Regions:
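Membrane pore-forming effector domains from diverse proteins
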Residues: 72-84, 88, 94-206
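N-terminal soluble segments of membrane proteins
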Residues: 1-11, 184-222
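Positively charged, hydrophobic/aromatic-enriched amphipathic segments
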Residues: 1-48, 110-137, 341-361, 366
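Intrinsic-disorder-associated interaction segments
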Residues: 14, 33-37, 170-179, 183, ...
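An N-terminally focused, membrane-permeabilizing/fusogenic/translocator signature enriched
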Residues: 1-88, 94, 212-216
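Tandem repeat scaffolds
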Residues: 228-425
């Protein structure tokens, strides 16, 4: 294997919005025998916070629910077994706030030449807040000369979250108007401010002889902060806001059309608190990570929709059509799903505690590791459903129908029968 000669790695760091996301990537070369670099240990430090951005006559505060750290390697590789950072981590908060550390899940994946770390907060959490002190990310195996490491942190529409809006509209607008306008602002911020990346760090080999120990990135000189003191004018955005506010309709689909939004793809991760979507057809929509607490979703068509990690606590989904929908890791605590059709839906690891599922159709649904504690399942159809690892504590199952289910031991079957469940076949 061709190895570089005596080298000193050089770095460049660019944090575009350091008040909201600040990233450092440090390297420690591991020498082989003499002066050749055989491996490079990577160490990550990352800070998440909220940031104000002036827009027209007002301003918005935003943060991030997650994002992706992508690394591209030149003449190097980092196979999965060389990844160190993975699983749940704690983000330390400012001591002056006296708040508890925030938990964040980090998933590592990708090819050996282009590994990826996906960051995501807990379901229902607003934004990531706090700092991860310098932590070993993994080890790069150097394959030749010249070598290079490029790391970029990017966010998608589902990762950007508004925590406050001031001076752009009245607080008396409807929940539907608010949901559409906030989503328009998120996409505007993403397209005009947050792309192509939030942070970028580049390390590369130096062809000249020098010391072997690398220096940490010079972030002071290369970090660029946005100027949040001056108001920026965006007349087209102001026009959209005005047209949504003055619209003679509160229909969600019509408001989305006025704002130039596609309801099937533009609301992933959106905050849709308390909106009215009763009877609306959003079959096949990408609503992953959406926040729908307290929303009226009765009689909706959400068949085949992606609602992974969605927050639907207290929402009314009575009579909704959710067949084949991906509802894994979704939160339905105290939601009403009475008479809903959830046939063949993926409810793995979903929180259905205290939910009303009376007379719902859950046939052939995947309820692996689902929480059904204190759920109302009386008269529900549960035939062919998979209950591996499901929790049934104090759930109501009178006249609920079971047949050919996976994951139900004889002990559980007896317990459910004693509570009034009906087993057929």
């Amino acid at each position: 294997m061709q190895q570089p000669s005596s080298t000193t790695p050089l770095s460049q760091t660019h944090n575009r919005y350091p008040d909201s996301l600040y990233l450092e990537l440090a390297t420690t070369p591991v020498l082989s025998g003499g002066t050749d670099i055989e491996q490079i240990d990577l160490y990550l430090r990352i800070d998440f916070h909220e940031q104000w951005q002036p827009i027209n006559a007002g301003r918005v505060k935003f943060g991030f629910k997650g994002g992706e750290l992508k690394i591209h390697l030149e003449n190097g590789k980092m196979p999965t077994e060389c990844h160190q950072l993975s699983g749940w981590v704690q983000l330390a908060t400012d001591k002056t706030t006296q708040s508890s550390p925030i938990e964040c899940q980090v998933l590592s994946q990708g090819e050996a030449e282009s590994p990826v770390w996906t960051w995501q907060g807990k379901t229902g959490m607003s934004v990531l807040q706090g700092s991860l002190p310098q932590t070993k990310l993994g080890t790069v195996q150097v394959m030749g000369q010249p070598w290079g490491i490029e790391a970029v942190f990017t966010v998608s529409p589902g990762d950007v979250y508004l925590t406050s809006v001031e001076g752009l509209w009245s607080h008396t607008i409807s929940p539907n108007q608010l949901a559409v306008l906030e989503r328009k602002l998120v996409l505007f911020l993403l397209e005009s401010k947050l792309q192509p990346y939030l942070s970028r760090v580049v390390w590369h080999s130096d062809q000249h002889p020098g010391q072997q120990k690398s220096e940490p990135p010079n972030t002071e000189d290369q970090t660029v902060e946005i100027d949040t003191g001056e108001t920026e004018e965006y007349p087209e955005l102001a026009d959209v806001i005005q047209r949504v506010i003055t619209a003679e309709t509160d229909n969600f689909l019509e408001l989305a059309k006025i704002a130039g939004l596609n309801p099937l793809v533009d609301f992933s991760g959106a905050k849709l608190l308390g909106i009215n979507l009763s009877g609306v057809d959003l079959s096949g929509a990408n609503l992953r990570g959406v926040y729908l607490r307290g929303a009226d979703l009765s009689d909706m068509d959400l068949s085949g929709a992606d609602l992974q990690r969605a927050t639907l606590g207290g929402a009314d989904l009575s009579g909704a059509y959710l067949s084949d929908a991906d509802l894994s890791h979704a939160d339905f605590h105290r939601a009403s799903l009475a008479l809903a059709n959830l046939s063949s839906a993926n409810l793995s690891s979903a929180n259905l505690s205290s939910a009303n599922l009376s007379s719902a159709n859950l046939s052939d649904a995947n309820l692996t590791n689902a929480n059904l504690s204190q759920a109302d399942l009386h008269r529900a159809s549960l035939m062919l459903a998979n209950f591996n690892g499901a929790t049934w504590l104090n759930s109501r199952v009178e006249e609920a129908r079971f047949s050919k289910n996976s994951g139900l031991s004889e002990e559980w079957k007896l317990d459910l029968k004693q509570r009034g469940a009906i087993f057929e076949g």
